Amino acid sequence: MQIPPQLKLLPLLFVLCSFTLTAQDYQAYWEAPPYEISADDSFFLDQLQHDTFNWFWNKAHGGTGLNPDRSTDHSTSNSHISIASVGFGLTAYGIGAERGYVTREQAAQRVDLALRALLRGKMSRDANGVIGYRGWYYHWLDANSLSRAWNSELSSIDTALMMLGVIFVRNYFDDPGNDLESAIRDSATVILERVDWRFMRNPNNRGISGGWRPESGFINFEYRGYNEAMLLYILAIGGDLNPLSESSWSYWKSGYRIQTTTNFAHPFIVFAPLFGHQYPHAWIDFRGIYNDELEILGEKYDYFENARRATYANRAYCIANPKNWPNYGETEWGLTACDGPKNFGYNGYQARGASGPNVVDDGTITPTAAGGSIVYAPEIVLPALRHMKDKYGSKLYSDHGFRDAFNDSVNWFDTDYIGIDQGPILLMAENLRSELVWNTMKKDPIIVRGLQRAGFTGGWLETTAVQEEIAPVRKFKLGNYPNPFNSNTTITFELQQTQYVALDIYNATGQKVTTLLDTRLQAGAHSLSWDASKLPTGVYWSRLVSERGVQTQKMLYLR
């Protein structure tokens, strides 16, 4: 078979399969009639969302508001934090406020607590006693000490998932007259602006590393080819500090595989576990925005349609059931990363999936595989979720939502809930019902910049009011460290020539607090210490005025 000429122009690996393809009754999302949410659907989704929200709210660490990696119904300490779970949790708090599960004030207080904890932890290249380095966070944290747990890696993808939650709360809590919401926006901005995006880039191939350890350096793995790292590249290209160039997107997409599967006749960009098709869409609306790597799949083809096809392919595999599991079928399906019945001789936690070069299937189904795809294909997801809840009852479902996974062939039901599996269920259900998360994220310049610089055009990107910001010229390299700080911080700046300088400190309301300098200084680097111990915590600004211009620097004082 001759490969189309347009394919040769794209850095894609197009796999033409010789499988016998099963005919499918399938419609692209723009062809299918809009799904009408019935009263019964609304009742079911209300309960599912509320119960899943309860897990994030009730199981968060009490002293920090940060979310654990996993828990059981009866877990109480919940101090082992997953920063990816925190990203879903921050977003969940906004959904809870919008749905009335908690008040907006309660949600804002919880978010403020969590952001302050993330800022309070120490950032350095030390191996112990630190929360992260260069603005990136360790995969797992001990909430009691706000430091690295289990010798985990400084994780690129998990930091990105957390940052999406930070972006969400920066834009959701938008009341300019509310001091608490203003503090949330300020804290979120500091967290976002200090991520050194270029730090994780492999200088040899433009790819983003899977992570870094102080003991051994960068992990020997870069994200390349379609998976959940789409969100990581969009943030890194659109970020504030040392963003990656557009060429990084070209490197990432050069590993794409486009193919059909044995049981699904429609080609799509494959990644076997469904979570890779879900995480980016939980926050970003990819409907109607296009990129050149998608042209070969059709004029209207977008990443939303790609995720819909992946969902249908996953279900089609389970219906075909080549391994003859006793329960697979039209309403019992869903393969992605999840726990498993390891004690029964099966796999434990593993990235299961049903498309791409490797099928991983040991009979273990997880509700998040279907639930995280509800926005793409509610017509097949809602019947599956209802069926699993009704059939297995309290063995699989509780007032914290669905437990992580089950394997009917050995009568195994997980006792754990996992944050990164709970999150897609809650966020995607909200996007189906109100598009709250998507619409909130569209307000942020990091998201808009990242998409536009990666080459996305069309749809809502053409009408957004968010314009790419021009970075200010840092005439004096005004800065301070540490930032955030506890009582004392050192303010630094540089002068190109001898000149008059005034350096003042202002609080968040614009009132001058003190004058640190009002004199003539020689050219060169300068620094001075500022003691804020007698002032209330919060946001402060240093303002440097000279004969050559003005520059300001935001500083965050925490205790």
Q: Each PLM stretch: what is its role?
A:
Residues 4, 469-559:
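C-terminal outer-membrane/trafficking sorting elements
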Residues 10-18:
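Bacterial N-terminal signal peptides
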Residues 24-462:
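Ser/Thr/Asn(+Pro)-rich, low-complexity disordered segments
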Residues 2-3, 213, 245, 531:
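Short, solvent-exposed coil/turn linker segments
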